């Protein structure tokens, strides 16, 4: 019996002792438990990855919606600004038009007043000239008589009113 034989016997006894205490089953059990734990962690990681992808997709969808809403709001604001500017321009043009019309009316009124004043002055001048000529042409008795009867004054007043 050599040393190798005794080493072999020792090895067989050691392996038998390990089998008796169920060490290989414990090792297999621990390895299975560890493999299960690793598999569970991988499954959890996959689930978290899928969840993260869903969250990312949801975020991207919401971001796209927000971008679209922002573009719609900007477009609506631009349309509203254009409408306000157009309305302001229309009101300004209308205001200028009304002011021009009012100025033209004032000018026409001033022209009419000037014509009336000139016409009235011309009538007064004509009446005065007529009075002077009539007084010069008539003798003083007849002139006094006409003035006393007020026919002359009344006819001059009527003529003045008619010419004005």
From Swiss-Prot:
Record GO cellular component, one term: proton-transporting ATP synthase complex
Alphabetized Pfam families for the sequence: ATP-synt_B
Chain segments annotated as transmembrane: 4-24
Keyword field: ATP synthesis, Cell inner membrane, Cell membrane, CF(0), Hydrogen ion transport, Ion transport, Membrane, Transmembrane, Transmembrane helix, Transport
GO terms of molecular function: proton-transporting ATP synthase activity, rotational mechanism; proton-transporting ATPase activity, rotational mechanism
Keyword Ligase: no
Domain of life: Bacteria
Entry membrane topology: Single-pass membrane protein
Compartmental location: Cell inner membrane
UniProt function note: F(1)F(0) ATP synthase produces ATP from ADP in the presence of a proton or sodium gradient. F-type ATPases consist of two structural domains, F(1) containing the extramembraneous catalytic core and F(0) containing the membrane proton channel, linked together by a central stalk and a peripheral stalk. During catalysis, ATP synthesis in the catalytic domain of F(1) is coupled via a rotary mechanism of the central stalk subunits to proton translocation.
Record-stated family: Belongs to the ATPase B chain family.
Quaternary structure note: F-type ATPases have 2 components, F(1) - the catalytic core - and F(0) - the membrane proton channel. F(1) has five subunits: alpha(3), beta(3), gamma(1), delta(1), epsilon(1). F(0) has three main subunits: a(1), b(2) and c(10-14). The alpha and beta chains form an alternating ring which encloses part of the gamma chain. F(1) is attached to F(0) by a central stalk formed by the gamma and epsilon chains, while a peripheral stalk is formed by the delta and b chains.
NCBIfam families: PRK09173.1
The protein's name: ATP synthase subunit b 2
């Amino acid at each position: 019996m050599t040393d190798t034989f005794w080493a072999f016997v020792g090895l067989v006894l050691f392996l038998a002792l390990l089998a008796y205490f169920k060490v290989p089953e414990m090792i297999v059990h621990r390895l299975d438990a560890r493999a299960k734990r690793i598999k569970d962690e991988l499954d959890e990681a996959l689930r978290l990855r899928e969840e993260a992808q869903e969250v990312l997709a949801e975020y991207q969808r919401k971001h796209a919606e927000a971008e679209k809403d922002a573009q719609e709001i900007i477009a609506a604001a631009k349309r509203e600004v254009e409408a306000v500017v157009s309305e302001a321009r229309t009101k300004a043009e209308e205001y200028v038009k009304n002011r021009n019309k009012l100025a033209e009316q004032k000018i026409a009124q001033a022209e009419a007043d000037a014509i009336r004043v000139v016409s009235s002055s011309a009538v007064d001048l004509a009446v005065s000239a007529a009075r002077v000529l009539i007084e010069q042409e008539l003798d003083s008795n007849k002139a006094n008589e006409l003035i006393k009867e007020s026919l002359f004054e009344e006819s001059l007043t009527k003529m003045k009113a008619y010419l004005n």
